[in-house]
């Protein structure tokens, strides 16, 4: 029965492993890029702006409209074909083709074309900003999983150490080298270590859930990250920390979150010109071709109406003309639109300055945080070395029976805490360095 249960457990574990999906950092970035809803919205915005930019060039061409009408006329009415008054009822039918070409409109068309192209650049910058943010969020979430994995490993290693020492202590107690009461302290420590493993596993599960939600994956899907090579931590320690002013100037000149305001200001300026052009005269070339039919039209002597096709052909007319429109009063709408355009420019300038100020503050803080993280990691390395030496010494004394179980378990806890602190300092330093890489447009991979 036990053998059967063991086989069932092994089969279940094998199935779970087979169903597990292994993902790399780059695969996570690709998944987030493909699945993120905000990015899909941004891509749709870019496509919308691109179509608007392409169609705006058609404004340079003349338009063409076809029209047709059919009327029943009663009472005293002018026949549109003969232009004679008729007192009887009759029916008329007409066709028109009209084309209008803009000759002058104060630059409205040319500025509209320029504006749609600029709006496309704004949409592109917005999408790039969203893409960079999503990629950075994936890096942060991936690092959180890596950190939780290492914390769980430390907790498991601590259990192994405590279990090993418990077995040794039992042998020493049986030999009379240490009192049996020392075993209780170590057993209590083992229970605490088991609780730490449960808590670490729960934190790991949470970080995996956060990562899956970011990647728009099913929360129940079983994934496992692969650990990238982060052995170049010493490079961060030894490399000079970039100057805050240099990093800030680069970010302000190149990051999409700032550059989008440059294009937005261009768009706002063109919008102001378009609003101002509404106060200028417009000149248009108009051409029209039309024809009419009336069932009340008769040729001399003959009492029957001309055939439909004959009238349509004979009544064909062509008109070419020029139309000039001079705006005099438009209920203040032109003035209001110009004022709103000015306010839009001011608002964009303020948003741009706020973004620049925020960027400088964030970069300065990020540089300070990186310096502090490097110092913390170096201190954590020294702390672990000292804790390891203290643990080795306490273990030797405990095995000789000259140290209490309390002293020994305390040394274990201090060493485990030092290991945890070093891991935390390592990932904090990597994270802080990646923030600087983000501002400098360097690769966010490891």
Features from the language model and the residues they span:
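Sec/SRP-type N-terminal targeting helices
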Residues: 40-44, 57, 89, 103-131, ...
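Sec-dependent N-terminal signal peptides
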Residues: 4-13
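Periplasmic alpha-helical coiled-coil/stalk elements that build and connect Gram-negative outer-membrane
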Residues: 133-250, 369, 373, 415
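Bacterial Sec-pathway N-terminal export signals of envelope proteins
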Residues: 19-67, 75, 219, 226-266, ...
């Amino acid at each position: 029965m036990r053998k059967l249960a063991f086989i069932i457990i092994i089969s279940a574990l094998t199935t779970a492993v087979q169903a597990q999906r292994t993902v790399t950092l780059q695969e996570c970035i690709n998944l987030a890029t493909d699945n993120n809803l905000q990015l899909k919205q941004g891509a749709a915005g870019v496509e919308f702006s691109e179509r608007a930019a392409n169609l705006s060039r058609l404004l340079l061409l003349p338009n063409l409209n076809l029209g047709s009408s059919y009327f029943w006329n009663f009472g005293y009415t002018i026949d549109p074909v003969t232009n004679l008054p008729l007192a009887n009822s009759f029916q008329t039918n007409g066709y028109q083709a009209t084309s209008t070409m803009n000759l002058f409109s104060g630059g409205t068309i040319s500025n509209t074309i320029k504006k749609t192209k600029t709006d496309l650049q704004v949409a592109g910058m917005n999408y790039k900003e969203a893409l960079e943010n999503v990629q950075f969020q994936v890096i942060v979430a991936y690092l959180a999983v890596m950190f939780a994995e290492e914390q769980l490993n430390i907790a498991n290693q601590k259990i192994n150490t405590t279990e090993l020492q418990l077995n040794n202590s039992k042998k020493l107690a049986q030999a009379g080298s240490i009192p049996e009461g020392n075993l209780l302290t170590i057993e209590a420590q083992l229970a605490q270590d088991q609780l730490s493993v449960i808590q670490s596993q729960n934190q790991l599960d949470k970080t995996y859930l956060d990562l899956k939600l970011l990647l728009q994956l099913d929360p129940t899907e079983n994934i496992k990250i692969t650990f990238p090579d982060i052995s170049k931590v010493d490079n961060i320690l030894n490399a000079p920390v970039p100057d805050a002013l240099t990093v800030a100037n680069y970010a302000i000149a190149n990051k999409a979150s700032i550059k989008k305001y440059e294009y937005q200001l261009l768009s706002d300026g063109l919008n102001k010109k378009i609003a101002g052009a509404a106060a200028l005269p417009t000149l248009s070339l108009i051409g029209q071709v039309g024809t009419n039919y009336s069932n009340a039209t008769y040729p001399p002597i003959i009492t029957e109406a001309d055939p439909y096709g004959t009238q349509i052909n004979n009544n064909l007319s062509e008109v070419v003309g020029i139309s000039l429109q001079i705006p005099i009063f438009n209920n203040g709408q032109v003035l209001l639109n110009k004022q709103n355009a000015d306010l839009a420019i001011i608002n964009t300038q303020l948003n741009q300055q706020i973004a620049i100020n925020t960027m400088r503050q964030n970069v300065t803080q990020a540089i300070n945080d990186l310096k502090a993280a490097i110092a913390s990691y170096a201190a954590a390395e020294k702390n672990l070395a000292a804790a390891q030496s203290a643990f080795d010494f306490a273990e030797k004394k405990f095995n000789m029976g000259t140290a209490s179980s309390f002293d020994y378990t305390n040394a274990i806890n201090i060493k485990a805490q030092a290991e945890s602190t070093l891991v935390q300092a390592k990932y904090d330093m990597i994270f802080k360095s990646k923030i600087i890489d983000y501002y400098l447009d360097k690769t966010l991979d490891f």
